[in-house]
């Protein structure tokens, strides 16, 4: 894995250059003059002062796939796999902290909820390397365990909780339910409490919602059990947004199709 960490550092250095170049380009842009001309930003008229308050984030997806390639097992499948995952994310955080010290700008580490890149990166890698890990059509978000892992709520939160504190640019974990868990609020409260204990800083609950476009019946179904219509609006959460499944990107459609519930309530 030494070669991997060397390549990881070189890639992080490239990201630093790209992020700084983007910030400097923005500072020189005249397209934002309207902010100052219309007194929408009152504290300064200097673009350098304005942009330095922002964050330059190193983001990552596909930690579990990385572990699978390096160790032939997934992130949640052994203590050694989890430890390697933590080591990788700690290295990324170290790079972000170093860049902040070197430049004086707000570099941070972001656990990316990839949308377009989730599928695009996997497709590009599969064309180049033909590795089965990228052949499924998407990469798993940030440090999440694979969506088809079927592990329990508690194991998922325990595994992912190790990473939240390292990602100072933002992070989120999800729990996947087979159906809407509205009849068991106590179970949701237990999940939230356990997430807090494990260091999870932001938690979301996922569950499918199907709505019949003909009669309005709601639930989870392929064909409406009330009117037998197959004209169904399917709402799912992806990358933090509730959207109609028809409008998902290719990679996210692959991800949703692979999802398995972490609990049945």
Segments the model singles out, each with a brief description of its role:
Residues 1-265:
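Long, C-terminal-biased catalytic regions of enzyme "large/alpha" subunits
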């Amino acid at each position: 894995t030494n070669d991997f960490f060397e390549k990881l550092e070189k890639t992080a250095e490239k990201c630093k250059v790209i992020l700084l170049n983007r910030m400097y380009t923005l500072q020189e842009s005249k397209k934002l003059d309207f902010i100052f001309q219309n007194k929408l930003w009152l504290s300064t008229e200097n673009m350098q002062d304005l942009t330095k308050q922002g964050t330059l984030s190193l983001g990552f997806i596909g930690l579990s796939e990385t572990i699978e390639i390096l160790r032939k097992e997934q992130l949640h499948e052994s203590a050694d796999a989890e430890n390697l995952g933590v080591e990788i994310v700690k290295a990324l955080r170290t790079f972000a902290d170093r860049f902040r010290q070197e430049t004086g700008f707000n570099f941070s580490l972001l656990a990316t909820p990839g949308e377009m890149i989730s599928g695009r990166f996997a497709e590009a890698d599969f064309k180049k390397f033909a590795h089965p890990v990228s052949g499924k059509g998407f990469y798993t978000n940030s440090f999440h365990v694979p969506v088809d892992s079927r592990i329990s709520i508690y194991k998922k939160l325990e595994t992912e909780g190790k990473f939240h504190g390292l990602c100072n640019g933002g992070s989120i974990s999800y729990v996947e339910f087979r159906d809407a868990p509205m009849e068991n609020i106590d179970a949701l409260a237990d999940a939230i409490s356990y997430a807090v204990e494990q260091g999870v800083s932001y938690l979301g609950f996922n569950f499918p919602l199907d709505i019949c476009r003909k009669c309005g019946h709601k639930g989870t179904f392929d064909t409406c059990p009330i009117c037998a219509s197959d004209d169904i609006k399917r709402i799912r959460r992806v990358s933090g947004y509730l959207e109609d499944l028809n409008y998902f990107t290719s990679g996210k459609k692959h991800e949703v199709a692979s999802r398995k519930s972490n609990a049945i309530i």
